[in-house]
């Protein structure tokens, strides 16, 4: 089976169960995750194409903001509960034909709301549109996810993980 952390956990449970009941069925897991968060790897299958997609999408969003006669603020929330690789890939939008995103916030670093607002005001004072990339898993100093600071409804996925969404909404 090919999959991420939850899939590998399922493979382990199936393998353990097969041993328990004396079955000779063997289960094999091939790790793959776009989060790029598997230990002892340089990069994981799936990450490269996802990173390319993020960079291309961010470039399109940046260009979309250029059509307005007034400055806009666009916050894009990107997957990454505990790993900011995909959000960091938004920096790849920068090139000869694009200035890139203005701000990037990763889950590996505490999110400071006051500092964030200062940076937004600083960029806005220049009279231009901005695009901000935030990971779904950014947290404030007390450990709460940013999305928990707004009116949110808690959902869990099929594996029982709290679905993180709404950081950009906050």
Label the predicted regions:
Residues 35-43:
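Glycine-rich, charge-decorated loop segments at or immediately adjacent to ligand/cofactor-binding or catalytic sites
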Residues 1-3, 9-28, 44-170:
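Accessory alpha-helical/coil subdomains and C-terminal extensions
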């Amino acid at each position: 089976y090919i999959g991420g952390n939850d899939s590998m956990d399922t493979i382990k449970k199936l393998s353990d169960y097969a041993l328990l009941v004396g079955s000779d069925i063997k289960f094999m897991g091939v790790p793959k995750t776009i989060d790029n968060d598997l230990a002892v790897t340089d990069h994981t299958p799936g990450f490269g194409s996802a990173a390319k997609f993020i960079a291309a999408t961010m470039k399109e969003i940046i260009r979309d903001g250029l059509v307005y006669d007034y400055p806009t603020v666009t916050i894009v929330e990107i997957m990454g509960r505990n790993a900011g690789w995909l959000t960091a890939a938004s920096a790849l939008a920068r090139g000869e034909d694009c200035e890139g995103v203005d701000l990037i916030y990763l889950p590996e670093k505490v999110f400071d709301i006051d500092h964030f607002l200062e940076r937004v005001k600083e960029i806005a004072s220049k009279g231009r549109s901005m695009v901000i990339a935030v990971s779904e898993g950014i947290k404030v100093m007390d450990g709460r996810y940013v999305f928990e600071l707004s009116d949110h409804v808690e959902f869990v996925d099929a594996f029982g993980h709290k679905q993180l969404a709404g950081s950009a909404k906050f």
